[in-house]
């Protein structure tokens, strides 16, 4: 809702168990990156990795900014060419509403 209000729409992504099992390790608690996965799943892997360090019942969010953090096209709306600042507006709105 905060993202929608400031023009930075977002949605919750899944944390698939089938990807988490690819992050199992014989020498570490968890691998940072899943074995045998391409870049397409990195955002999901990041969320799964972070979840390992959050206690049950504690609300948390993985805000992945790799995709929208840089706009290489022409300026449009408040999007300038270059660094976008996504999700700064969303986080500020969320803080202002709390």
Region locations from a protein language model:
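A generic structural signal for tightly packed, nonpolar segments enriched in small/aliphatic residues
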Residues: 1-98
């Amino acid at each position: 809702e905060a993202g929608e209000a400031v023009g930075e729409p977002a949605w919750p992504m899944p944390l698939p168990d089938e990807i988490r099992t690819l992050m199992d390790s014989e020498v570490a608690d968890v691998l940072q990156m899943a074995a045998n996965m391409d870049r397409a799943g990195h955002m999901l892997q990041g969320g799964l990795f972070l979840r390992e360090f959050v206690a049950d019942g504690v609300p948390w969010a993985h805000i992945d900014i790799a995709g929208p953090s840089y706009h290489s096209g022409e300026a449009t709306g408040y999007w300038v060419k270059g660094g976008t600042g996504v999700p700064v507006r969303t986080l500020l709105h969320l803080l202002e509403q709390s």
